[in-house]
Amino acid sequence: MFNQLFDTGEDLRPKPMLAERLDNPDPLTYLVTLRRGVKFHDGHELTAKDVVFTYGQMIDPSFVSPFKGAFRSLKSVTALDYYHVRFTLKEPFSAFAIQLAGPPAIVPDGAGPDFADHPIGTGPYKFVRFAVDDQVVLAPFEEYFGGAPRNNGVIIRVLPDDTMRGLELQKGSIDLVVNDLPPDIVHQFEGKDFHIAKSPGLDYSYLGINMLDPVLKDKRVRHAIGYAIDRHAIVEYLRRGLARPATGLIPSQAWAYDPDIFQFTYDPNRSRQLLDEAGYPDPDGDGPLPRLRLSLKVSNAEESRLQATVIQQQLRDVGIDLDVRSYEFATMYADVVNGNFQMFNMQWVGGAMVDPDILRRVFYSTQTPPAGYNRGHYNNPEVDRLLDLAGAATTEAERKKYYGAAQQIIAEDAPYISIWNRTNVAVARPTLSGLHLNPTGDFEALKDVTKSGV
C-alpha cells in the first residue's frame, strides 16, 4: 500500500523508489528529487508537501513513533518546490541516506488520527476493508507508478495457528504463506505439487545478555555459553536447514559485513574450561549437580520454546542449569525493555538490519530503553568511539572500516550470542507463478505474482 523515498536492493544499498535522485552537497544537507507523476490512491499527485509532512512528524516532539530514533540527527525538512526536498542535519550522519529507504512510508499531507480507518498510499495495492483479527482486503492500483499489479488483488488473512495455516494452504482456501510456516510444516509440502521459493533472509535469532547481571557480566561465562551452543545442529535439525548459523547482527548480504569477526564454534570442552576459570567448577564430576544456574526468557510460541529446550540441553551438558521461562510475547517484551531478565531469546526482523547503523541503536552505551534498543546495558567506550567515527565518515570505505572494528569488539564482548539467520520461505499453491523473495522477505513482490484459472 505504501512506498518509501528509496527501496533497498539485493545488496541492501538504497535504490530509487518515490525519489529518483539523492544529492549530498555537504555533510549536513541531503537533496531529494521526487519522481514526477506519482499518484496517491485517491488520485492526487505526490509532492514535496507530503514528504515534509511525513518526516516532519519524525522531528515533532509531540509525535510518538518507534521510528523516530533513526532520525535523531535530522534538524529540518523543507520543500524547495513541488518536486524537491531539502533535509538538513544537526551533525554529519553518513547513515542518513539508508534511513530514507526504511520507515516511515510517505503519507498524504495532513493525514490525521482517522487515517488508519482508510489509509491512502502510493503503493501497488489500495485499501478496501479491514476486519480485526480476520483479514485485510486490498485491490490493485492501476495507476501505480511501477506498473499495475499482475493480479486482481490480495486478501491477507489472519491465521494465528501454525497448523491451521498449513491446513488452509493444503486444502486451497489460501494460496500463499510467506515466512509464516515452521520448518516441520514446510517440510510436509516438499515433493508435492506446491511451489517452494527460498532466499537467504535477514531475520536474526540471538540470546540477549543482561550485562549488569553479577554472573553474566563476566565475559568468561558469556563465552562459555557461546561455546556450548551447537548452532549447526539447531539449523540442521530444528530449523531443517531453513537458516544459516549467524555471526552477528550485521547480515552477510550487507556491504559492511565483516566475515573475519570472532565467531563461537561448538566446543563444550572450552566451555567447561572457561567455567572453571570463572570460578564455577564441576561440583560432582559426572554427577547431576550443576556448576551454576541461569534463566532464559522466551515467548510461548512453539518454535521459541523448542529452540529454548535444545539450548537448555546443550548448556546442561557443560554444567549450566538453564531455567527456561515462556510468556506471552507482550509480557516477555515488557520484561526485556525493563531489564528484568538474565537472558532472553528474540529475533531482529528483516529491514531493521539493512544498514550497519543498527549497531548504534543496539550497542551504543546511551541507547538503553526507552531511547534505544540496548536492552542489556552493554557499555564499551571504544565501541561508542568507533560508531561515532562511522556515523561521521564521508565514504563507504571509511564506514566499513569503523563498523568492522566495532563488530569485532562486540563479537568478542558477546552482549549478544548469535544463533541463526532465517532462510526466507514462501509456500504457494501450483496455480501461482512469478513469486520472488527479496532479502527482507516483505510483500512487495506480490504485484508480480499471477494466478492461473481466474
Language model features with spans:
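Ligand-site clamp/hinge motif
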Residues: G110-P113, F141-H187, Q312-Q313, D321-D323, ...
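Extracytoplasmic/peripheral linker and loop segments enriched in polar/acidic and small residues
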Residues: V235, Q273, D317-M332, M346, ...
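N-terminal lobe/hinge region of extracytoplasmic solute-binding protein
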Residues: M1-D26, L34, G56, I120-G121, ...
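Surface-exposed binding/hinge segments that line
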Residues: D23, T33, F67-D109, R129
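Append "and occasionally in soluble cytosolic enzymes with long acidic Gly/Pro-rich linkers
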Residues: V137-P140, E190, K217-Q313, H377-N379, ...
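Long beta-strand-rich cores associated with HINT superfamily self-processing modules
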Residues: A426-V454
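Ligand/substrate-recognition segments at binding pockets and active sites
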Residues: A278-G351, E396, N424
